[in-house]
């Protein structure tokens, strides 16, 4: 039954459709039956040449004859049914790219790629294709953003399609692709499913594992996922790797950096020894070299970076600009207006907190969203979908988005802080200028970091154009200067709640709501000098020693208000001393203003003005929420 349903693809793509799910429930018992594949898949099943290619060349002779490929070589196949001739690349062939229609791959793939406007391959794709189609193990070092996903995808998809045309599709996967992040895994899965009708599944944490188990029971051709979730599925017995013939490690160095090294080795130990392994990495640390020696057999090395070559993709223009902290959001706004011109822009920050704060500040003038590790998976997917579809054009992200995300047509990347390493600069900047398109990357730095800019230039082999200083005095974003967020909470001395001076309108510009070192400190009360509520030091709810201390304070101390302060307690809703809490939501400003709403609380007692009219020096006195 599952075999019949699988041939009904693309009814189900990326997840089990409602119809398929209903059929699965009715046929649950039948779905447990595993249709074994026919004889072991031939080693050269993916090559239509009459010459037997073997899964790998072995022996000294084969190793000696093995070529090492580079981007500037004309990579066509030997004369065979694919129609290409050795040495048939003209001098400009490498520049023009290799035509997909001449590869001799399945017409289904050619048609799908053509529908996406892909008719030629870029250098990494051209360099990878020949050894991959010949079944050779491979280690590829490539520039970021040059389309390597399609490079290893085409040979795998072609192999699976040809196999399924000759054999009944089985239940267990023929290929597995490991990626360090869920975003990269989803990108790879999307590339595979958009290029053919093979059955794929993307597995990663943060989503119900039961749904992934059901889909695996249904039968898939390719598993793409993060090592952690793959290990979980293996432990549950839901994933069987006994028929895997292709293994891909994408962004392998990043799997090491996020702690997946042991999981990767466990997975490699579980796949059959007779397989083709393709590994791609921007860098080659010791762990990558050890993996190569242990798990790859006579691998072809493809280095499209080189020690002296520029590591950024071509077409990215680089700029730098000096800016001090308090003015940075305003400068950022001007950069976006000038260089993005309404197009897509990604702004990278160092921390999750900075991404949230900057998103809030920039949201006053731009359509933007934050993306970082604390955002739920569902929200992250909605954010990425909205950005791709143009519902908003500015994404403020941490480095979770710096590697592997395929977001088309990003016009501008801005490094809000100088990256910690040249390598990180490359990965961040690689979000623009992808697949041969033009893009810009701008680094914002302090005047003291000019030397660090020179170091990046030396390491990467690039040159920044220094932009002139931008005058942002009077900008709407200056009042929400990044420094005003302060440290230890959304606010600090000198800056108000969410960065406004004096919070919700205080005259003192002191003691920021949502405070410093905890929800409000030093002058608390949603931004009031010396007043209570949500603060500390002379009355601060949500502050020190319970919900308020020292001088009585809204949501108070010792029973929602102390030392003469009404607040939801003492003296009711404010008789003789402050509606909703004297020295809290009431006295000396409560929600803001120095001198407003003092004495005479209540929601409308003569001369009251409790709540302080949300700000304004001396505003709300004898008034506020309606008194005569």
Swiss-Prot record:
GO terms for cellular component: cytoplasm. GO terms for biological process: Group II intron splicing. Residues 510-548 have a biased composition (Gly residues). Residues 331-478 form the Helicase C-terminal domain. Keywords: ATP-binding, Helicase, Hydrolase, Nucleotide-binding, RNA-binding. ATP binds at residues 142-149. Pfam families: DEAD (PF00270), Helicase_C (PF00271). CDD domains: DEADc (cd00268), SF2_C_DEAD (cd18787). Residues 496-548, 571-628 are annotated as: Disordered. Residues 500-509 have a biased composition (Low complexity). It catalyses: ATP + H2O = ADP + phosphate + H(+). GO terms for molecular function: ATP binding; ATP hydrolysis activity; RNA binding; RNA helicase activity. SUPFAM superfamilies: P-loop containing nucleoside triphosphate hydrolases. Its EC number is 3.6.4.13. A motif (Q motif) lies at residues 98-126. Residues 129-302 form the Helicase ATP-binding domain. InterPro entries: DEAD/DEAH_box_helicase_dom, DEAD_box_RNA_helicase, Helicase_ATP-bd, Helicase_C-like, P-loop_NTPase. It comes from the Eukaryota. Belongs to the DEAD box helicase family. DDX21/DDX50 subfamily. The Q motif is unique to and characteristic of the DEAD box family of RNA helicases and controls ATP binding and hydrolysis. This is DEAD-box ATP-dependent RNA helicase 9. It comes from Oryza sativa subsp. japonica. The lineage of its organism: Eukaryota, Viridiplantae, Streptophyta, Embryophyta, Tracheophyta.
């Amino acid at each position: 039954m599952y075999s019949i349903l699988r041939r009904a693809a693309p009814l189900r793509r990326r997840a089990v459709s409602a119809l398929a799910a209903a059929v699965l429930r009715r046929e649950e018992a039948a779905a447990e039956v595993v249709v074994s594949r026919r004889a072991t898949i031939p080693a050269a099943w993916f090559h239509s040449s009459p010459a037997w290619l073997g899964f790998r060349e072995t022996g000294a002779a084969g190793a000696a004859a093995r070529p090492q490929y580079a981007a500037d070589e004309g990579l066509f196949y030997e004369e065979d049914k694919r129609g290409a001739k050795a040495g048939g690349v003209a001098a400009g062939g490498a520049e023009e790219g290799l035509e997909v229609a001449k590869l001799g791959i399945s017409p289904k793939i050619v048609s799908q790629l053509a529908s996406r406007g892909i008719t030629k391959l870029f250098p990494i794709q051209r360099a990878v294709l020949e050894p991959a189609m010949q079944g050779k193990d491979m280690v590829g070092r490539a520039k970021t953003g040059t389309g390597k996903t399609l490079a290893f995808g085409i040979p795998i998809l072609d192999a699976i399609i040809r196999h399924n045309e000759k054999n009944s599709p089985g239940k267990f996967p023929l290929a597995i692709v490991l990626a360090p992040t869920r975003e990269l895994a989803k990108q790879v899965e999307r590339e595979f499913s958009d290029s053919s009708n093979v059955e794929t599944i993307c597995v990663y944490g943060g989503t119900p594992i039961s749904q992934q188990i059901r889909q695996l029971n249904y039968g898939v051709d390719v598993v793409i996922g993060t090592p952690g979730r793959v290990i979980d599925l293996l432990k549950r017995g839901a994933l069987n790797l006994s028929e895997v013939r292709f293994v891909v490690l994408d962004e392998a160095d990043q799997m090491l950096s996020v702690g997946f090294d042991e999981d990767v080795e466990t997975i490699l130990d579980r796949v059959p020894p007779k397989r083709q392994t393709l590994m791609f990495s921007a860098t080659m640390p010791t762990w990558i070299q050890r993996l190569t020696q242990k798990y790859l057999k006579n691998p072809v090395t493809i280095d499209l970076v080189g020690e002296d070559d520029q590591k950024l993709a071509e077409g990215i223009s680089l700029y730098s600009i000096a800016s001090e902290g308090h003015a940075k959001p305003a400068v950022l706004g001007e950069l976006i207006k000038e260089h993005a011109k309404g197009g897509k822009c990604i702004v990278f920050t160092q921390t999750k907190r900075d991404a949230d704060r900057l998103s809030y500040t920039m949201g006053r003038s731009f359509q933007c969203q934050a993306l970082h590790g604390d955002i739920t998976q569902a929200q992250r997917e909605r954010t990425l979908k909205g950005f791709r579809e143009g519902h908003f054009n500015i994404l403020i992200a941490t480095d979770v988005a710096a590697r592997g995300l395929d977001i088309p047509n990003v016009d501008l990347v801005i490094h809000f802080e100088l990256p910690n390493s040249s390598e990180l600069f490359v990965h961040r900047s690689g979000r623009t200028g992808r697949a041969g398109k033009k893009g810009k990357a701008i680094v914002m730095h302090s005047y003291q970091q000019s030397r660090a800019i020179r170091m990046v230039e030396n390491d990467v082999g690039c040159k920044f154009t220094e932009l002139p200083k931008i005058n942002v005095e009077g900008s709407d974003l200056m009042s929400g200067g990044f420094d005003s967020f302060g440290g230890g909470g959304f606010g600090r001395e000198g800056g108000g709640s969410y960065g406004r001076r004096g919070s919700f309108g205080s005259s003192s510009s002191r003691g920021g709501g949502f405070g410093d070192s905890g929800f409000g400190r030093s002058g608390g009360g949603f931004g009031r000098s010396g007043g209570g509520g949500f603060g500390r030091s002379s009355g601060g709810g949500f502050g020190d020693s319970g919900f308020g201390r020292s001088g009585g304070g809204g949501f108070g101390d010792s029973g929602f208000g102390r030392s003469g302060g009404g607040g939801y307690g003492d003296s009711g809703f404010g008789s003789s001393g402050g509606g909703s809490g004297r020295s809290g939501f009431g006295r000396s400003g409560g929600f803001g203003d120095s001198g407003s709403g003092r004495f005479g609380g209540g929601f409308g007692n003569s001369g009251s003005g409790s709540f302080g009219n949300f700000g304004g020096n001396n505003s709300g006195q004898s008034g506020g929420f309606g008194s005569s």
